[in-house]
Amino acid sequence: MEEIRAWRHVFKLDPNKPIDDERLERLCESGTDAVIVGGTDGVTIDNVLDLLARIRRFSVPCALEVTDVEALTPGFDVYLVPIVLNSRQAEWIIGRHHEAVKQYGDMMNWDEIAAEGYCILNPECKAAKLTRADTELDVDDIVAYARLAEHLYKLPIFYLEYSGVYGDPSVVEKVKQALDQTQLFYGGGITTPEQAEHMARYADTVVVGNAIYDAFEQALATVAAVKQMAGQRNGDDGK
């Protein structure tokens, strides 16, 4: 999906967390490339629909990260489907996906759906515990998952998810070096524009989530930081 390939900065909103109208407006008009709606727990059709309706007052592209098929609804520009590559349970790799397609496959517009190959690396986060992710990985393990995502499974997105803690930029750099066509998303622990800029040196797309609720002004400042670094990278590529 070409529109996703253009994303450099993305905000992720949790439908189970409150955000007032004034902050939502500032976030949607901040210059971010997209807003992803998604969370690990407490995601319902009601809170997803409520957040979607509020975001739709603005022109920013809006994606739903599908973690619970019961909260699936029309109206989003893109549907992102996580495949947790380092999960110890098959349901997070293929099981839930099979069940969703079994129920709704006839109605799916596959042009609006993109799979994300997740590698969850924070053992304390809700997502790691829920999916029983094997987080005891060295950099070679992580790079191997990235290569599997691109070359074996042909996934359009590889998502390094540190969820709540700031990751190791050297790991992100090595993963980026291993990828050619697959787009590298990074999410986790970004609370300052400096951190966002650092990760944007390597990741194709930087996702900012928790800072929206914990450090809102800093979260907004990450947009310009990421865009500036993305511009520098594009300039370097053009030399």
UniProtKB/Swiss-Prot annotation:
<dbReference type="InterPro" id="IPR039074">
    <property type="entry name" value="GGGP/HepGP_synthase_I"/>
</dbReference>
<dbReference type="GO" id="GO:0120536">
    <property type="term" value="F:heptaprenylglyceryl phosphate synthase activity"/>
</dbReference>
<comment type="pathway">
    <text>Membrane lipid metabolism; glycerophospholipid metabolism.</text>
</comment>
<dbReference type="InterPro" id="IPR038597">
    <property type="entry name" value="GGGP/HepGP_synthase_sf"/>
</dbReference>
<keyword id="KW-0460">Magnesium</keyword>
<dbReference type="GO" id="GO:0046474">
    <property type="term" value="P:glycerophospholipid biosynthetic process"/>
</dbReference>
<comment type="function">
    <text>Prenyltransferase that catalyzes in vivo the transfer of the heptaprenyl moiety of heptaprenyl pyrophosphate (HepPP; 35 carbon atoms) to the C3 hydroxyl of sn-glycerol-1-phosphate (G1P), producing heptaprenylglyceryl phosphate (HepGP). This reaction is an ether-bond-formation step in the biosynthesis of archaea-type G1P-based membrane lipids found in Bacillales. To a much lesser extent, is also able to use geranylgeranyl diphosphate (GGPP; C20) as the prenyl donor.</text>
</comment>
<comment type="similarity">
    <text>Belongs to the GGGP/HepGP synthase family. Group I subfamily.</text>
</comment>
<comment type="subunit">
    <text>Homodimer.</text>
</comment>
<keyword id="KW-0443">Lipid metabolism</keyword>
<keyword id="KW-1208">Phospholipid metabolism</keyword>
<protein>
    <recommendedName>
        <fullName>Heptaprenylglyceryl phosphate synthase</fullName>
        <ecNumber>2.5.1.n9</ecNumber>
    </recommendedName>
</protein>
<dbReference type="GO" id="GO:0004659">
    <property type="term" value="F:prenyltransferase activity"/>
</dbReference>
<dbReference type="Pfam" id="PF01884">
    <property type="entry name" value="PcrB"/>
</dbReference>
<keyword id="KW-0479">Metal-binding</keyword>
<keyword id="KW-0444">Lipid biosynthesis</keyword>
<keyword id="KW-0808">Transferase</keyword>
<feature type="binding site">
    <location>
        <position position="12"/>
    </location>
    <ligand>
        <name>sn-glycerol 1-phosphate</name>
    </ligand>
</feature>
<feature type="binding site">
    <location>
        <position position="189"/>
    </location>
    <ligand>
        <name>sn-glycerol 1-phosphate</name>
    </ligand>
</feature>
<dbReference type="GO" id="GO:0000287">
    <property type="term" value="F:magnesium ion binding"/>
</dbReference>
<feature type="binding site">
    <location>
        <position position="14"/>
    </location>
    <ligand>
        <name>Mg(2+)</name>
    </ligand>
</feature>
<feature type="binding site">
    <location>
        <begin position="209"/>
        <end position="210"/>
    </location>
    <ligand>
        <name>sn-glycerol 1-phosphate</name>
    </ligand>
</feature>
<feature type="binding site">
    <location>
        <begin position="159"/>
        <end position="164"/>
    </location>
    <ligand>
        <name>sn-glycerol 1-phosphate</name>
    </ligand>
</feature>
<dbReference type="InterPro" id="IPR008205">
    <property type="entry name" value="GGGP_HepGP_synthase"/>
</dbReference>
<keyword id="KW-0594">Phospholipid biosynthesis</keyword>
<feature type="binding site">
    <location>
        <position position="40"/>
    </location>
    <ligand>
        <name>Mg(2+)</name>
    </ligand>
</feature>
